[in-house]
Amino acid sequence: MTDFAVDDGGRLAGAARGRNALALAIFLLTIAAFLLRFTISPEVLDRFENYTGDGGSFLQKLHVGTYAILLVAPLALISRPIVLRGDEIGKFKALLRFVLLLVGLMVYLGLVGHISTSGIFIDTYLAAGVAGLIMMAQSEAARRRIGDVIVVMLLVSALMGVFEAVTHHRILPYDNVEAQFRPIGLTEHPLALGTLCAAGIGFAMATRWPVWARLLAAFVLLVGCAVSGARFALLTAAVEVFALLLLTPWPKLTRRHARQAKAVVLILVLIGGAALVALLASAGLLSRFGDGVFDANAMVRVSVYDIFGHVGWQDLLFGMPADALVEVVQKQLHLPTLESAPIAILMLLGLPMALLFVGALGWTMLRVLRFARASTRIALLTFFVAALSNNALSTKTPAVAIALVLVLAFSNREAAKSAPDRRG
């Protein structure tokens, strides 16, 4: 009997070690896949393959990080049991339905001959949905560690942006020619750097880092947003800072003491913010604000609505290929890019499919936000408000995936476990 007990114990210990090794492997592969998608810009990828240029096979038009995420997904979802409780089941179902809807959308685009359009939705939204499913397959500790890694990535990007703004030398390749130098950090565009830094402030405050580390991270991200030249993103970041201060609970203080403490901190933030603006302006890092917020570049986002005079009703109902849309924007409207996510999604998908897609995206985001901390909610709202001012939602970017991964990383999982599952 003793020998059998020892054998059983050895087998159980060996099985436990095997499960731990598999969990660690999936965790590391997940981080590697996410970082591939989140840090390799289109300009870098173009050095190795024809990712954004004309011609080439469709397989070349998908990001290497997207392939990595799609390869990790079966391993994370099938290789071991997934333990979901309470409201987590509803979140998993919501993400799965969103992914299936996108697969159906890809089939639709292929049937109507708009295969070039599908690359945008695969790289931006399908990869984000699959990344969300991978996150749901992780343990609570693994999710939070992944979130910490992504926040550190945003901090590195912000610090790179500050270095680039000071030295006027970009670390990564950037092919666009601009009248004024703007840093990009680890992103593909200065506006993307500003958007992610702005949203990252709230996500940094949602971590479990020491208070001083969270405040330092928020400060670095705010400076990164400021030097990026993304004016609207900086305005949303400023509003976000006040929202985080006023709307997030301070559980270790009574309500009365919390109000008093917030009033003192608010005064300090106003003084510190004024000093920061003066310092950055004196260093010439806020030159983009010299012409105000609504200059010629900002008016491009208004003049893009003239596109309705250059397309037919068939385009409005059934959409148009991505290359045809670019041709209209550049040759008819004489604009370099289409920096309007609503117009881009409408013209790429057509009105019925665009309404279906936007509704599904909004519903999915609201569903995964359930039981998220106030700082996480504020961060996601900041992200979408800032992203709507540029093309982060309508081109092949990792921004949506980054936001979704961070929301799932910093959700209140204990509350989700105890809550009953709801339909949807």
Tell me what each language-model feature is:
Residues 47-54, 171, 287-349:
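Long extracytoplasmic/lumenal interhelical loops at the membrane interface
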Residues 377-386, 392-424:
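Transmembrane alpha-helices of multi-pass inner-membrane enzymes
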